[in-house]
A protein has these predicted regions:
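Conserved N-terminal beta1-alpha1 strand-loop-helix module at the mouth
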Residues: 2-74, 79-82, 90-91
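Surface-exposed charge patches
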Residues: 11, 35, 86, 107, ...
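Catalytic beta/alpha-barrel core
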Residues: 45-50, 73-79, 93-101, 115-121, ...
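Acidic-residue sensor for enzyme active/binding pockets
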Residues: 46, 125, 140
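Active-site-adjacent beta->alpha loops and helix N-cap segments on the catalytic face
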Residues: 49-64, 83, 98-111, 123-127
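Conserved small/polar residues in nucleotide/adenosyl-binding loops
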Residues: 134-141
Length: 141
């Protein structure tokens, strides 16, 4: 379950002004990167679901951050379907980012009061995103 609610996460992102996006298959390397970012003032970190062992590494990062980086909101990126979003939310994701807008992911996140930032690459995709979303990720097409 998420440690921080939607508003807290969005405030952390706003106050930091950026969100590092990272993946590595080695949990120890990933922990060092999370800690370095935290020590540098980052309070929201996106780990991407893009490679081998992503689920296992993410679970370790969440546990590590709870102890070593208590104000860090750990989110998951590259999410394209609701089942994967739900799995990462069970592992402790505080926010979900995707390369596209998927209304089913939005429902999963909204039920849990977790921030969802869909990617949009066209005006049409922006138009499909509900008005209640305050953050969209723009992608070049």
């Amino acid at each position: 379950m998420a440690k921080f609610d939607k508003i807290a996460v969005l405030n952390k992102i706003g106050s930091t002004g950026m969100v590092p996006v990272f993946y590595h298959k080695d949990a120890e390397v990933a922990k060092k990167v999370v800690k370095a970012c935290y020590d540098g003032g980052v309070r929201a970190f996106e780990f991407t679901n893009r490679g081998d062992f992503a689920q296992e590494v993410f679970a370790e990062i969440v546990k590590f951050a709870a102890k070593e980086c208590p104000e860090m909101a750990i989110g998951i990126g590259s999410i394209v379907d609701p089942a994967t979003a739900a799995m990462y939310l069970q592992l402790g994701a505080n926010f979900v980012v995707g390369p596209l807008f998927n209304p089913e992911i939005a429902k999963v996140c909204n039920r849990r009061s977790v921030a969802y930032t869909p990617g949009c690459g066209s005006v049409s995709e922006v138009g499909f995103a509900p008005v209640s979303y305050t953050h969209l990720r723009a992608h070049e097409t």
